[in-house]
Amino acid sequence: MSDGDYDYLIKFLALGDSGVGKTSVLYQYTDGKFNSKFITTVGIDFREKRVVYRANGPDGAVGRGQRIHLQLWDTAGQERFRSLTTAFFRDAMGFLLLFDLTNEQSFLNVRNWISQLQMHAYCENPDIVLCGNKSDLEDQRAVKEEEARELAEKYGIPYFETSAANGTNISHAIEMLLDLIMKRMERCVDKSWIPEGVVRSNGHTSADQLSEEKEKGLCGC
């Protein structure tokens, strides 16, 4: 796809404590590479990737491909950047929430991150995929898979164990998040409505319509 040759621009935000591997996960997804020497993100950064999304119909048939330009925003996890990070929550349509499988505190802080999303995202029930990262470091694991899955089930969100080092489940997690977003859009009664964080290739957004649809409860917020 050439520049501008897409149906939708969709913004995802990666968030979680500092050091959980947000930058490495996004870099693995967009470039297929792992860099163990990344420095801690300061403020906000982003990466981009073009994909084709094909929805399955009720009869299992694959629908027409939607050309998607993904913007994957990488946020600083440190407390001193928290106000800057939350300012970007409303501009994103989906959230990749990461914790470090070798760091129990980063897992315990997942609840705080979800609370922040519920307060600052485009609605109280945004689309989130939870990722326990660094699954390749099994001998250093501090969080049991059952614990993480139980927490994800409590919030009704998908859970994946990922590794930026070898790429395990990273594409699956982001594809799942994209699928949740596209299905949310399909559920909208007014098909001309596109949520914040989603831009048509003509550059038009619909922030005003978002508030109206949220009040009507049309899109599952």
Swiss-Prot record:
Binding locations of GTP: 16-24, 74-78, 133-136, 163-165
Activity control mechanisms: Regulated by guanine nucleotide exchange factors (GEFs) which promote the exchange of bound GDP for free GTP, GTPase activating proteins (GAPs) which increase the GTP hydrolysis activity, and GDP dissociation inhibitors which inhibit the dissociation of the nucleotide from the GTPase. Activated by GEFs such as DENND10.
Protein purpose: Small GTPase which cycles between active GTP-bound and inactive GDP-bound states. In its active state, binds to a variety of effector proteins to regulate homeostasis of late endocytic pathway, including endosomal positioning, maturation and secretion. Plays a role in cytotoxic granule exocytosis in lymphocytes. Required for both granule maturation and granule docking and priming at the immunologic synapse.
A single GO BP: natural killer cell degranulation
A cellular component term, taken from the record's GO annotations: lysosome
InterPro entries, alphabetized: P-loop_NTPase (IPR027417), Rab27a/b (IPR041837), Small_GTP-bd (IPR005225), Small_GTPase (IPR001806), Small_GTPase_Rab (IPR050305)
Keyword Secreted attributed: no
Bilayer disposition of the protein: Lipid-anchor
EC class of the enzyme, as a word: hydrolase
Modification N-acetylserine, positions: 2
Tissue-wise expression: Detected in melanocytes. Expressed abundantly in the stomach and is predominantly localized at the apical region of gastric-surface mucus cells. Also expressed in the thymus and lung.
Cysteine methyl ester: modified positions: 221
PROSITE patterns listed in its UniProt record: RAB
Motif (Effector region): 38-46
S-S bonds: 123-188
Subunit structure: Binds SYTL1, SYTL2, SLAC2B, MYRIP, SYTL3, SYTL4, SYTL5 and MLPH. Interacts with UNC13D. Interacts with RPH3A and RPH3A. Does not interact with the BLOC-3 complex (heterodimer of HPS1 and HPS4). Interacts (GDP-bound form preferentially) with DENND10.
Residues with lipid group (S-geranylgeranyl cysteine): 219, 221
Protein species of origin: Mus musculus
Residue list for modification Phosphoserine: 2
Record family assignment: Belongs to the small GTPase superfamily. Rab family.
A single GO molecular function term of this UniProt record: GDP binding
Record carries keyword Signal: no
Designated name of the protein: Ras-related protein Rab-27A
